[in-house]
Regions:
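Bacterial Sec-dependent N-terminal signal peptides
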Residues: 3, 22-46, 195, 228, ...
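An aromatic- and glycine-enriched ligand-binding surface/loop that stacks and positions planar moieties
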Residues: 27-94, 200-201, 217-371, 492-495
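Conserved, well-structured interaction surfaces
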Residues: 46-55, 59-65, 90-168, 182-190, ...
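Flexible, polar/acidic helix-loop-strand segments at domain edges
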Residues: 95, 99-105, 329-413
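Long, intrinsically disordered, low-complexity segments
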Residues: 121-124, 194, 260-320, 326, ...
């Protein structure tokens, strides 16, 4: 999606249209009230009105993105990994909930799961199925117009089912309004089959590009890219590779020269994005993550960790020696040696930001350090010595005037497709092809890291892991990657994250390696699959809870 006022207006009108046309009883997924009314005749006799109805599905891109609330109640799932630390220890807010889940994962249950997508997901699927059924019954449009409407709707149905599948594996499948109160889950294979079918249909119908008035819509490239992503999760390696190949064959997208440009709206590698306006829709990402000094008593809810910083290679592709900073020293950390993606992702002590030099130190004026648990809430302060830079809007300088954020959310971009194909080729035994795609990402003109060569087996997998961690940092992938690789229970148990406590010292600064958790983190193997919500179990006699959650 690219900027377009027509689409923006359409989305907002569509939210009212949905209430009028399709959401009678929207709190009850099994509501089967007939909708053969005047509203159906109005919708399906006017393509503009039907399109507004369809536009109500586009905000799902926002809901499940890093600026939305449907993944983890507005938290970044990176807070469940070694790469990000939330600053509060009080459950019930964005910062504290994440810490609660990594320290006491037993908190997750069928009656309380902040990562749950079941109820909201099925509500959205019902809306899509109702749209499709209503279209088939009442549409007066041409076959081509109907096909384009159906392709977009089925794209979003696959998109929502993917959110369920990556949490639960096999789920209850509904493709029409023939709803059953008691229905069992389908298998994981059947669930992935439906997702693939919807996306392949979308790819077969959607245009490579829309006209200017519709340029924000999902395209053939978005359908192929989403298919590549979902088939990677399904471990259908050939299907993932083939879908990725189809994206490249379109010859529409190219990597941006500069890494930081890949997150701006309308850039050359953006395949699917969602745009915002001050007047709405908008988001609050800056309010949550800007550094101390940007706004009063807010921001800095979560920050990159020392573990993440040390994951970055040097500009010449080598591992940087951080041993001097695993104690106390007044020597400046080697930030200037790190590859370009570091400075585009992390606001470090000494970085330039909005005309200021960051001072992420105790008592700092632009950026300020606080010990974890020294206060209930960070209020803009960092507990790691770092702040997030990626996604923040450097032009947003006065929060007293504009309190909301409008930077674009890029859901799918070409670098991810390179890395999907790299992993698929690795799984298929094509090590050389996998390395070519990893190197394509590493060697974009503005970065130009040395090419990797001669890697195979586990060494190649480590390189792919490294690139996904760095290239896709804070884009919502790492936690889910570690789950699908079944590595979370091995690497995310009995560990703590760290930071650098920076203190003014004799006209300079002292850097002290500190424990930012003060207790071990845990990952329970049973959380590889999330529990079915209690309400579903209570109202559906055909479904059983997973053995791990009984």
């Amino acid at each position: 999606m690219k900027n377009g006022e027509i689409m923006k207006t359409g989305i907002k009108i569509a939210m009212m249209s949905l209430l009028t046309f399709s959401l009678v009883g929207c709190n009850d997924f099994l509501d089967t009230t007939p909708h053969d009314s005047i509203s159906d005749k109005v919708v399906w006799n006017d393509i503009h009105t039907a399109t507004l109805y369809l536009n109500g599905f586009y905000p799902y891109i926002d809901r499940y993105g890093q600026f939305g609330s449907a993944q983890f109640q507005g938290n970044l799932t990176e807070g469940l990994t070694e790469t990000f630390k939330y600053g509060s220890y009080v459950p019930g807010n964005k910062a504290g909930d994440s810490n609660n889940y990594v320290f006491t994962p037993e908190t997750m249950s069928s009656t309380g799961n902040l990562l749950d997508a079941w109820t909201g997901g099925y509500e959205r699927i019902r809306r899509i199925n109702e749209f499709l059924e209503s279209m088939r019954k009442h549409s007066t449009f041409s076959a081509e117009e109907n096909a384009k409407l159906e392709a977009q709707a089925r794209f979003f149905r696959a998109f929502v089912y993917f959110q369920l599948a990556k949490r639960h594996g096999g789920v209850i499948l509904y493709t029409d309004m023939n709803l059953q109160k008691n229905k069992d889950r389908s298998s994981a294979s059947e669930t992935w089959d439906l997702i693939a079918s919807d996306l392949k249909y979308a790819a077969s119908v959607l245009p490579v590009r829309w006209d200017a008035a519709n340029k924000e819509r999902v395209t053939r490239g978005a359908a192929w890219a989403m298919l590549a992503r979902t088939m990677l999760y399904a471990e259908r390696w050939q299907d993932a590779k083939d879908a990725a190949d189809s994206v490249f064959k379109l010859q529409v997208y190219s990597l941006t020269d500069k890494y930081e440009d890949a997150f701006k709206g309308g850039n050359s590698e953006s395949i699917l994005e969602y745009n915002y306006l001050v007047t709405g829709p908008n988001h609050t990402f800056d309010n949550d993550y800007v550094p101390y000094g940007d706004m009063d008593n807010d921001g800095g809810k979560g920050c990159p960790t020392q573990e993440m910083v040390e994951s970055y290679q040097s500009k010449d592709g080598k591992t940087v020696d951080w041993s001097k900073w695993h104690g106390e020293t007044t020597e400046l950390p080697p930030y200037d040696q790190l590859e370009p993606r570091f400075a585009a992702t992390v606001l470090y002590h000494g970085a330039q930001w909005k005309g200021h030099t960051m001072t992420n130190s105790v008592g700092g004026t632009y950026g300020q350090y606080m010990d974890y648990r020294s206060d209930t809430y960070p209020k803009g302060r960092t507990t790691t010595g770092y702040y997030l830079r990626k996604y923040l809007d450097e032009s947003h300088t006065d929060f007293s005037v504009i309190k909301v954020s409008t930077q674009t959310w890029v859901e799918l971009r070409l670098a991810e497709i390179y890395l999907i194909r790299a992993e698929a080729n690795y799984r298929l035994g094509a090590s050389g092809a996998a390395l070519e795609d990893v190197n394509a990402v590493r060697q974009r003109p503005g970065m130009n890291l040395p090419a990797l060569s001669g890697l195979s087996g586990n060494d190649l997998f480590k390189a792919i892991r490294q690139e996904r961690k760095i290239e896709l940092a804070y884009e919502g992938h790492l936690y889910w990657d570690m789950r699908r690789w079944k590595l979370a229970d091995k690497e995310y148990n009995g560990y703590r994250v760290h930071g650098l406590k920076i203190t003014p010292h004799q006209g300079a600064f002292k850097f002290e390696y500190v424990d930012c958790d003060l207790q071990d983190r845990k990952f329970l193997a049973k959380t590889y699959v999330f529990p079915i919500p209690y309400d579903e179990l209570a109202n559906n006699s055909a479904i059983e809870q997973y053995d791990e959650w009984k």
